[in-house]
Design a protein with these regions (language model features):
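Conserved HGGG/HGGXW glycine-rich cap/lid loop of the alpha/beta-hydrolase fold
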Residues: 6-63
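Conserved alpha/beta-hydrolase catalytic His-Asp/Glu region
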Residues: 127-136, 148-207
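Catalytic active-site module of serine/aspartate enzymes centered on a nucleophile-bearing elbow/loop
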Residues: 240-270
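Conserved loop-alpha-helix segment in the C-terminal half of the alpha/beta-hydrolase fold
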Residues: 208-248
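Conserved catalytic-core motifs of eukaryotic protein kinase domains, centered on the activation segment
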Residues: 35-37, 61-66, 128-130, 226-227
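Flexible "cap/lid" loop of the alpha/beta hydrolase fold
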Residues: 102, 106, 111-150
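Active-site loop/oxyanion-hole signature of alpha/beta-hydrolase fold enzymes
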Residues: 38-45, 51-96, 107-109, 261-262
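Alpha/beta-hydrolase active-site loop signature
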Residues: 30, 55-59, 98, 123, ...
């Protein structure tokens, strides 16, 4: 099982295949490098050097007691890229993974990067004056606090989010597999990550992005992100390109894999 041990002693798991331009994949919260990209990894590896990483306390990576933060995951990413001698990579992040990407740029700039792929990302979860794109279309700070309180009482709110991640629900056995995958992240770690996500605000970072950037958003029954945040982000990131997946919800990589794989591979190689 390939891992990179980062400075605090935590082993970070990765999987790698293929040759060509480097494409690094960061999946969403509580999901894994082995399970998340089941419809994508092998197809992308036909034309790219693909590397998928388990965030700390996810999947096969180490499960330290804490603390857990987006910033720590960003620093872990930097150590993995250096250890694998990755340079000029296209870095693709989904949801939480995209937050890790934006935090990486805050802390490390464009080091080892050539392109960004922002997939189903939120840059501020909660409501704010003038902010038209909160999670669920309306997510007051009080709701965030209530969600965290509920998570401390029961695991159910953490794993329940998967039901709203698809425009068309997957088969029951697939949903069960994803639920089991999510259970690999300890509850305490997941709560710390969610707390950090709720506090995060990356809106001002977008205007500073100076790499070619692809934006991918689903538009079918997208419960977490019902608004046109993709169009807004396209206006914030100079020269970015938006791909709207009309037949997918919050999971275009799973619901429209052929188009997703083709779009990502062409962008990485272009």
């Amino acid at each position: 099982m390939p891992t990179i041990t980062v400075k605090d002693g935590t082993p970070i798991y990765y999987r790698e295949a293929g040759q060509g331009p480097a494409l690094v994949l960061l999946q969403g919260l509580m999901l894994t490098a082995d399970g998340f990209w089941t419809k994508n990894f092998d197809a992308l590896a036909r034309s790219c050097r693909v590397i998928a990483i388990d965030h700390r306390s996810h999947g096969r990576s180490g499960k330290p007691l804490g603390p857990h933060s987006i910033a720590q995951c960003a620093d872990d990413l930097g150590e993995v890229l250096a250890a694998l001698d990755v340079d000029k990579a296209a870095l693709a992040g989904v949801a939480f993974g995209a937050m890790v990407m934006l935090e990486y740029r805050r802390r490390h700039g464009n080091r080892r990067l050539a392109k960004l792929v922002i997939i189903e990302a939120q840059v501020r979860l909660t409501n704010a004056p003038g902010w038209e794109h909160p999670t669920f279309g309306n997510f007051p700070a009080e709701a965030g606090a209530g969600f965290l309180a509920a998570c401390r009482q029961s695991r159910e709110p953490l794993t329940g989010f998967l039901a709203g991640a698809f425009g068309t629900p997957p088969p029951a056995d697939e949903m069960a597999r994803m639920q089991l995958e999510a259970w690999q992240t300890p509850t305490a770690a997941a709560i710390e990550f969610v707390e950090d996500m709720i506090a995060a605000d990356y809106r001002a970072d977008l205007a500073k992005v100076d790499l070619p950037t692809l934006l991918i958003y689903g538009r079918k029954n997208n419960v977490p992100i019902p608004s046109e945040i993709g169009r807004w982000m396209q206006g914030e990131i100079r020269g970015s390109h938006l791909e709207r997946f009309e037949d997918s919800g919050h999971s275009p990589f799973y619901e429209s894999p052929e188009r997703f794989n083709r779009t990502l591979a062409e962008f990485a190689a272009g």
